[in-house]
A protein has these predicted regions:
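N-terminal, active-site-proximal structural segment of metallo-dependent hydrolase catalytic domains
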Residues: 1-47, 57, 62
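Short, flexible loop segments at the rims of nucleotide/cofactor-binding pockets, characterized by
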Residues: 6-13, 79-80, 118-120
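Nucleotide phosphate-binding site architecture
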Residues: 12, 74, 136
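Glycine-rich, phosphate-binding/catalytic loops in enzymes
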Residues: 20-23, 47-50, 85, 118-119
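Structured beta-strand-rich core segments of catalytic domains in phosphoester-bond hydrolases
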Residues: 37, 43-111
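Binuclear metal-dependent hydrolase catalytic cores centered on His/Asp/Glu-rich metal-binding motifs
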Residues: 114-126
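Single conserved hydrophobic/aromatic residue that forms the stacking wall/gate
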Residues: 127-137
Length: 137
C-alpha cells in the first residue's frame, strides 16, 4: 500500500502549480494533505478512482485536512472529540482493516510562541486519542 502525506499550504494555489499532475504521477493508494485552507466545493479536484474525505476549519481560508482514497475506509472520524480543538479541521482519521491512518495538521506555536500553550494542550489531547492507533501522517 502506498501512502503519501503532503502539507500543501493552500490546496487551491497548489492546483495551479502542478498538484494534479504530481498526484497522478505518485499513484498513491491514500493521499493525505494538510493545510488545505478551503471549504468543501471551493476547488475543482476530483481524481478518477478516488473518494475524497475532508475536514475544514470553521474559519474560512484556515488550516484543514483531506484524504483521497482508492479503497473506502471502514470508518471516517473528524476531529479528536474535544470541542476546544475540533473547530480548526486538523485531524481526519480513516479506519482500515488492521490500521488507522491519522492525518493531522499540528498547530503552529507562532511568532513569540503565542500559541505554545495551546499547541502543548493539543498534542496531549492527540496523544490521548491516538494511543490505540498507529500515527502515519
Amino acid at each position: 500500500m502506498k501512502l503519501i502525506s503532503w502539507n500543501v499550504n493552500g490546496l487551491r494555489a497548489c492546483l495551479t502549480h502542478g498538484f494534479a499532475e504530481s498526484f497522478a504521477a505518485l499513484d498513491a493508494d491514500i493521499f493525505s494533505v494538510q493545510e488545505t485552507k478551503m471549504q468543501p466545493g471551493q476547488a475543482d479536484f476530483a481524481p478518477e478512482g478516488y473518494t475524497e474525505y475532508t475536514y475544514s476549519a470553521e474559519k474560512k481560508g484556515y488550516s484543514g485536512t483531506a484524504c483521497w482514497c482508492k479503497t473506502a475506509p471502514l470508518a471516517v472520524t473528524t476531529g479528536i472529540g474535544l470541542e476546544q480543538h475540533d473547530h480548526e479541521g486538523r485531524v481526519l482519521t480513516l479506519e482500515y482493516p488492521g490500521f488507522y491512518l491519522v492525518n493531522c495538521y499540528t498547530p503552529n506555536s507562532q511568532d513569540g510562541l503565542k500559541r505554545l500553550d495551546y499547541r502543548m494542550e493539543w498534542e496531549l489531547s492527540l496523544i490521548h486519542i491516538s494511543e490505540p492507533t498507529r500515527l502515519l501522517s
